[in-house]
Amino acid sequence: MTDVDESVRRRTAAVSEYRKKLLQHKELESRVRTARENLRGAKKEFNKTEDDLKSLQSVGQIIGEVLRPLDNERLIVKASSGPRYVVGCRSKVDKEKLTSGTRVVLDMTTLTIMRALPREVDPVVYNMLHEDPGNISYSAVGGLGDQIRELRESIELPLMNPELFLRVGIKPPKGVLLYGPPGTGKTLLARAIASNIDANFLKVVSSAIIDKYIGESARLIREMFNYAREHQPCIIFMDEIDAIGGRRFSEGTSADREIQRTLMELLNQLDGFDNLGKVKMIMATNRPDVLDPALLRPGRLDRKIEIPLPNEQSRMDILKIHAAGIAKHGEIDYEAIVKLAEGFNGADLRNICTEAGMFAIRAERDYVIHEDFMKAVRKLSEAKKLESSSHYNADFGKE
């Protein structure tokens, strides 16, 4: 019995000792994990500190411009500060790219060319490129089938299949003018063709080009076309072209003369690029009557596409496109709505859908019914009558 008790006591002591060691092991494992995490954090902090020290100790570099090569090893460069230097070139730099006018990075101490830089781009031109045309399909443009076909023939076909024009023996159009009343879809057409072609898209608001300093506006036009040539295929869309493309006259202020200089630079650039080069121009205006004849002549703007007010069938197509995403209840008689929308443009038809939705919200509904559309078109018809009958005479505003 004594031996049994002794055996039980030893076993109990062994189990207790095992549990104690197990707890100690788990505690040590936890400490090791914590130490490893602290080590990772310390290494990260160390690397960050090393990078900061390198940044503080590093020497800046100079931007210069290649004037001309002297021989295979040396070039004449002009530093941004003004002086000219005869410098060497780093072995890893491709010397064929170092042509006259190339921007380069020079070492601060030895003035060795470290690498070539891309052409400097004006921030205004850079922002033009980052205008997103959106994801617009041709099916989202209603009632303009003929105009879409003509625009695609003038812009898309020369960019995608230039060999067709070579085989036939004709020169493709350089540019297209879209003209028509406001709200008929000129800008929408340009966005649709830009989003359906794998090409760069520069959207230019013509009034934003005009600068108060003489020569700056013409320089922007030059930079815009240079950038387009370097990033072919490219479509340049100039909205409200009447801001700079108005008819020239001999008299006027200095501001008028600056606008005329800008127009002359635009005319020169339109004549300058290759017919089969992949740079195409689309211009839009609702005042074609004020444009300069030199801008409108074939060879610059080869096609003039009128974007008219939609007829009854076109209004039906446009209204259905805008109403497609609206939550509706019951049957909608689009023919009755379209008959009341005589003289409406595409923007007005979109506004009908917006107003119908507002009537539904006012009635505390989350869907639109036919009566909402009828109320909306009647309301906007009254507004259109007011808009068309607003004639002001010389006595307006006088007591």
Swiss-Prot record:
Entry-linked Gene3D superfamilies: 1.10.8.60, Nucleic acid-binding proteins, P-loop containing nucleotide triphosphate hydrolases
Main location: cytoplasm
Pfam families associated with the record: AAA, AAA_lid_3, Prot_ATP_ID_OB_C
Gene Ontology molecular function: any one: ATP binding
PROSITE patterns, per database record: AAA
Site of covalent link Glycyl lysine isopeptide (Lys-Gly) (interchain with G-Cter in ubiquitin): 203
Keywords for this protein: Acetylation, ATP-binding, Cytoplasm, Isopeptide bond, Nucleotide-binding, Nucleus, Proteasome, Ubl conjugation
Residues where ATP binds: 180-187
Keyword field contains ATP-binding: yes
Cell compartment(s), UniProt: Cytoplasm; Nucleus
InterPro entries from the UniProt entry: 26S_Proteasome_ATPase, AAA+_ATPase, AAA_lid_3, ATPase_AAA_core, ATPase_AAA_CS, NA-bd_OB-fold, P-loop_NTPase, Prot_ATP_ID_OB_2nd
SUPFAM superfamilies: P-loop containing nucleoside triphosphate hydrolases (SSF52540)
Modification type N-acetylthreonine: residues: 2
Presence of the UniProt keyword Protease in the record: no
GO cellular-component term (any): nucleus
Family of this protein: Belongs to the AAA ATPase family.
PANTHER family: 26S PROTEASOME REGULATORY SUBUNIT
Known role: The 26S proteasome is involved in the ATP-dependent degradation of ubiquitinated proteins. The regulatory (or ATPase) complex confers ATP dependency and substrate specificity to the 26S complex.
Subunit structure: Component of the 19S regulatory particle (RP/PA700) base subcomplex of the 26S proteasome. The 26S proteasome is composed of a core protease (CP), known as the 20S proteasome, capped at one or both ends by the 19S regulatory particle (RP/PA700). The RP/PA700 complex is composed of at least 17 different subunits in two subcomplexes, the base and the lid, which form the portions proximal and distal to the 20S proteolytic core, respectively.
The protein's name: 26S proteasome regulatory subunit 10B homolog A
Gene encoding the protein: RPT4A
